[in-house]
Amino acid sequence: MMERFEKIEMKIPAKAEYVAIIRLTMAGVANRMGFAYDDIEDMKIAISEACTNIVQHAYKEDVGEITIVFGLYEDRLEIMAADNGVSFDFSSLKSKVGPYDINKPVEHLPENGLGLYLINTLMDDIQIMHDEGMTVLMTKYIQREQVENDGNPISTYNSY
C-alpha cells in the first residue's frame, strides 16, 4: 500500500527575489506540521541554498523557473527543488564538499560547494538527480518529543 501524503507544488521565476517566497511557504507548512523551531530554521537555510544554487547556476543568463514540491507525510516533510537548466556531475562535486577543517582560516575555505555541504548537514536525507536539469530532494523527519505546536497539525488524511 502506498504511503499517504499531501502535495503542495509551486513554480516561481528563477530569480533571487523570489527565493524568500519559497522559504516562507516552507516555514508555514513545517510549523503547521509540528516541526520544532530549530528544525524549521535549518530547513529554511537548506531550501534557500538549493534555490540559490538554481538561480546562480542553472540558467546562466536565461530566465527559467524553479519547481518546488512539498510532500507532507505523517512523520516527515520532503522538499523537492527542480530546474530544467544546465546540469552538473554531482558525484565529482560531492567528493569536494566538506567536511572542512575548522583549524584553517576562513580565507582558505572554497567558495563553491558550501551550499551543498550545508544542505547535507541540515537535512536528514538528501538525494540529487540530474538528467534534464537538476532535482534536489531533501527530507526532514519530525522529532515528536520536540514538537512545539501552537495549533492543530496538518493531517495527511482526508477527513471527508
Curated annotation (Swiss-Prot):
EC number(s) from the headed UniProt entry: 2.7.11.1
NCBIfam families, alphabetized: PRK04069.1, rsbW_low_gc
Entry keyword Kinase: yes
GO molecular function terms noted in the UniProt entry: ATP binding; protein serine kinase activity; protein serine/threonine kinase activity; sigma factor antagonist activity
Gene3D superfamilies (UniProt xref): Histidine kinase-like ATPase, C-terminal domain
Family stated for the protein in its record: Belongs to the anti-sigma-factor family.
Keywords, in A-Z order: ATP-binding, Kinase, Nucleotide-binding, Serine/threonine-protein kinase, Transferase
Catalyzed reactions: L-seryl-[protein] + ATP = O-phospho-L-seryl-[protein] + ADP + H(+); L-threonyl-[protein] + ATP = O-phospho-L-threonyl-[protein] + ADP + H(+)
PANTHER family: ANTI-SIGMA-F FACTOR RSBW-RELATED, SERINE-PROTEIN KINASE RSBW
Enzyme class, first EC level, given as a word: transferase
Annotated function: Negative regulator of sigma-B activity. Phosphorylates and inactivates its specific antagonist protein, RsbV. Upon phosphorylation of RsbV, RsbW is released and binds to sigma-B, thereby blocking its ability to form an RNA polymerase holoenzyme (E-sigma-B).
Phosphoprotein is among the record's keywords: no
Protein name, as recorded: Serine-protein kinase RsbW
